[in-house]
Every structure is written in C-alpha cells, then in structure tokens.
Amino acid sequence: MAMLPQEIIRKKRDGDRLDPAEIAGFIAGVTDGSVSEGQAAAFAMAVWFSGMNRDECVALTLAMRDSGETLDWSDLARPIVDKHSTGGVGDNVSLMLAPIVAACGAAVPMISGRGLGHTGGTLDKLESIPGYDIQPSPELFRRVADEVGCAIIGQTADLAPADKRLYAIRDVTATVDSVPLITASILSKKLAAGLRSLVLDVKLGNGSFMTDPAETEVLARSLVEVANGAGVRTSALITDMNEPLADAAGNALEIENCLAYLRGEKAGTRLDQVVMALAAEMLVAAGIAAHEAEAEAMARRVLGSGEAMERFGLMVHRLGGPADFVDRPGAYLAKAPAILAVPAGRHGYLTSCKTRELGMAVIELGGGRIRPDDRIDHRVGLTGLRPLGTKVEKGEPIAFVHAADQSQAEAIAKRVVTLYAIADEEPARRPVIVSKLRAG
C-alpha cells in the first residue's frame, strides 16, 4: 500500500531520505489532485528546510517529467540537443544559437518561456514577428525540427503538468528558492521534451536571479549532476550578467539584434563569446564535433556563410512568419514612435550598471508584464547599450530609449542615466564566461 502523503511529508520534514516510489506516488497525487494544495505546500517547505540528495532529486525530476506527455524524437536522424538559460537582460542567445547549431547538423526542438520578472522571454521576442506561431501542432513542431533543424515554441499543458501545479504553490509559499525544487522544475520540462543532451547557461550577477557566486555554483552543479543522473548528457556554463548581454533589451529590438548577429555584425562582443561557447558545448555534447575548437570553427563557418541566417528565416516562415522576414525585417517589425538618446552625465569610463533595473525600465515602457494578463508592446525597449569599460564624453549617448510617446521616453531616459556609474579610471574587465561545469 502506498504511503500516505502526510507520512511522506513527515519523513522529509524529519530529514529522512525518500525513496523513488514514495516520490513518484506523491507527485502522481499532485498531478491528479489527490494531494491537497496544503499537502503540496508542506512538502515543498519540508524540502526547502531538509533538502534532497542527488538520487532524491533525480527521482523527483523523473516523476515530474512522467506526470504528462513525453516527446520521442528517436525517429530523427539528427542528434537532439537543447539549451536552457536561467535568464537575464538582453539575453537573446537562443534566437541565434538554435539556427547555428541546426546548420551544423543537430536538431534543436526548443521549448521556451515568456518573460519572468525583470528578464525577457524568448516567446515574447518571437511574437514580435507577425504570424509566428508559438503553439503549432505537434506534427508541425516535429516536421520543422526535423527538416529545418530548429523550432522554438512554447510549453504545452501536457508537458510536466505536475511542475505547473507545484510551481504555482511554491510561488505563494516562499519556497521558490529551493535548489532541489528549482532543479526538478527546470529539468522535468526539458526531459519531457525528449532531448538527449543539454547545455545550461546559468547567469550570475546583478541582472540575474542569482547574485551570489557560491549559490550560483551550487545550482549549476545540482542541474548538471541531476540531469546526468537522469540519463541526459549535460554541462553548464556560468556566465556574467552584471550588464546586459546584447546591446539591446526589448522584444522587437532583440529580434533586430539577432539578425545583426547572424549577419556577422557582432563578432568579438560579450554576446558573441557566450553564443560561441554554448554552441561549442552543444556540438560536442551532440557528438557532431570532437572538441570545443572544432565545434567553434564549425559554428563560425555557418555564421559566416549565411547558413545560420537561412535556418532562422526558414524556421520563422515554417512556423507562420513572413517568407522574406530576414531580407526585409523593417517591413514587419513595429517601430516605437519616440526614440530618445540617454546622454552620459560626465566624461569617464562606464564602470557599473544596475542591470536588473534596466530590465525593469523595459517593463515599465510596456515591454514586459506586471500582471500575467498584461499585453506587451513589442516596439519598446533600449538600444545602443554601451558595454562597461567604454570611455564616454559628457553628453555622448550611452543608450537609446524606444517608447510609445515622448513623455514616457523622457521619464525613462532620466532613470536610465542614473543606473550607470562613470569614473575616471578604466575598470577591470570581467570575463563573460565565469566557469564551466561537467558531471563528475
């Protein structure tokens, strides 16, 4: 006979180890409703206080994965690989990474999310493109992933439904920041998508959800160990998010930035370093390249030849967007009516910025949601964001605000200028790739 939910809660509350059958039974109850909201909340709090070892976390991840549909890509000839980012400001990496890796021979069926807090969402960015369907039929999703090599869509209700219920409960019970629960939440959705290898981009800094280096490494290590324990080859990069990654933040503006990158216009930037490092990890994990140097050379080749841009355009068209989108993006991406420069308040070097607040400025412009049902203004945001370490003269633009009207542009420009520190001495450059983690 299965153990009662309250006995499982008691066992974890007292710091004892749960076996896989107990965890699977409890998560089945979360899914079918036989475990009450109060019991699920108590379980989450017990895990928050007592933690879980790797085997427990693997069992929790697999139980949540198996709570709904799981995708099977075994009929595809291409190796299946995916990437997940913990989120930041100006982080449009998925938009370039998927077509680059696809052009190198992998399949990237990427299930992405919307904006969360101050961070932008890949789906919101793609919805800047007229006609792009983030919820295609399963058949179309599979066909595009196979024939184009990449397809970026939204999560369906059938993937990891236990996570959806448990996350909603964690959100209102102060248990969001539990490493085992974060790990299982992220990985259950990724594993349900049927991938065979995964690369994680775990952000660190004042523009990420994790600001403490030690805590960030604990989360990255947990994700890597649990995913590998669940049978998916996984590695992680910890990357710097103490400034926006791209030089744009906002939905249509980040699509424009993506196209500029795919045209080869962002070589050598922090964004380029992250894209290439993740592409190399993915290609090695997929077995397409033997080592990172070979993988990066492949990625650079398809970027330079235009093959990656071609894949992006094909993905957009096959998922409902314009056939000539990459050739004529200006004809399709809406433009904000008010654009205003943000002038530097003095001469000197940009030494730091409040990245999270830059993300919140985009939300205040209408580029993100305060309430779940808010409509997004895809036109608005920030461009021309100067990287830290740049020497500027007084009055020189350090960013441009794109707003729905002039008064809003002026208000946000006044705020943005206060978010940057300028000093006489050039700051030390932070490496954008902080560290790499692999299993073992």
Swiss-Prot record:
The keyword GTP-binding does not apply. Gene3D superfamilies: Nucleoside phosphorylase/phosphoribosyltransferase catalytic domain, Pyrimidine nucleoside phosphorylase-like, C-terminal domain, Transferase, Pyrimidine Nucleoside Phosphorylase, Chain C. It is an enzyme of class 2 (transferase). The enzymes which catalyze the reversible phosphorolysis of pyrimidine nucleosides are involved in the degradation of these compounds and in their utilization as carbon and energy sources, or in the rescue of pyrimidine bases for nucleotide synthesis. Belongs to the thymidine/pyrimidine-nucleoside phosphorylase family. Pathway: Pyrimidine metabolism; dTMP biosynthesis via salvage pathway; dTMP from thymine: step 1/2. It comes from Rhizobium meliloti (strain 1021). Disulfide bonds: none annotated. Keywords: Glycosyltransferase, Transferase. This is Thymidine phosphorylase. It catalyses: thymidine + phosphate = 2-deoxy-alpha-D-ribose 1-phosphate + thymine. GO terms for molecular function: 1,4-alpha-oligoglucan phosphorylase activity; thymidine phosphorylase activity. It holds the Pfam family PYNP_C. GO terms for biological process: pyrimidine nucleobase metabolic process; thymidine metabolic process. Homodimer. PROSITE patterns: THYMID_PHOSPHORYLASE. NCBIfam families: PRK05820.1 (NF004490), T_phosphoryl (TIGR02643), Y_phosphoryl (TIGR02644). GO terms for cellular component: cytosol. Its EC number is 2.4.2.4.
